[in-house]
């Protein structure tokens, strides 16, 4: 986002200092939190961060994407991210009927058992 487009948001952040912003605004605004995607960033250490990852390789539902991350990889990510003080935003994609695909359910249940 250009600095001009980011300015109204920046002004709101100044007017409401309790407002939380992330690093995606652009325009030179760093935000309160880092939000790396599909990677666990070591450069986020020392500030609040939330790692955004998918359970396979696609954001949302994609019937052709069957490249599921293993339960072990997802648990490792969860452990790694939270041990560094971060949040783990794991994207799962229900289909058009609102049904979570069984491979996702299996992995989420494995994570729940681990917790």
Q: Each predicted region: which residue ranges?
A:
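Mature catalytic domains of secreted/periplasmic carbohydrate-active enzymes
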Residues: 1-115
């Amino acid at each position: 986002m250009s600095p001009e487009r980011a300015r109204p948001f920046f002004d709101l952040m100044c007017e409401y200092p309790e407002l939380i912003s992330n690093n995606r605004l652009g325009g030179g605004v760093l935000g309160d939190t880092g939000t790396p995607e599909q990677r666990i960033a070591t450069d986020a250490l020392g500030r609040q961060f939330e790692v955004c990852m998918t359970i396979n390789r696609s954001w949302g539902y994609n019937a052709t994407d069957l490249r599921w991350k293993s339960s072990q990889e997802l648990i490792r990510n969860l452990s790694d991210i939270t041990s560094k003080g971060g949040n783990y935003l794991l994207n799962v994609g229900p289909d058009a009927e609102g049904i979570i695909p069984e491979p996702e359910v299996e992995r989420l249940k494995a994570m729940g058992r681990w917790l």
